Amino acid sequence: MSQQLLEELGRRQYRTDIPEFRVGDTVRVGVKVVEGNRERVQDFEGVVIRRRGEGINENFTVRRIASHGIGVERTFLLHAPRIDYIKVIRQGKVRRAKLYYLRGRTGKAARIRERR
């Protein structure tokens, strides 16, 4: 009984406005941030280095290089209500499902070819 209830709740949370994107793509994720009584949308742009899970539990990790060359990674639930939008900026061409090797690279070594 509880499994059916969980599946029903999951179906209500499903989002249909999510674009198709893969590992290696550069995306811009709009995250809703609450500050006091105000709510605003904060952009986080970077390369998708991982997608995992399926259904309502699917998530993805985005990596970007912040100021002073420090890498920042954020993991988002794909169907989370906190995500306002996801925009695909650039489509990358990679041969791996997980791009963890980018953690050890900076600058030109961390570039990804563009998919046509």
From Swiss-Prot:
Know the name of this protein?
Answer: Large ribosomal subunit protein bL19
User: Which SUPFAM superfamilies has this protein been placed in?
Assistant: Translation proteins SH3-like domain
Q: What is the lineage of its organism?
A: Bacteria, Bacillati, Chloroflexota, Chloroflexia, Chloroflexales
| Organism annotation | Chloroflexus aggregans (strain MD-66 / DSM 9485)
Family annotation (InterPro entries): Ribosomal_bL19, Ribosomal_bL19_CS, Ribosomal_bL19_sf, Translation_prot_SH3-like_sf
Q: Which Pfam families match?
A: Ribosomal_L19
Tell whether Plastid is among the UniProt keywords.
Answer: no
Q: Which GO terms describe its molecular function?
A: structural constituent of ribosome
The Swiss-Prot or TrEMBL record describes its family as follows: Belongs to the bacterial ribosomal protein bL19 family.
| GO BP, sorted A to Z | translation
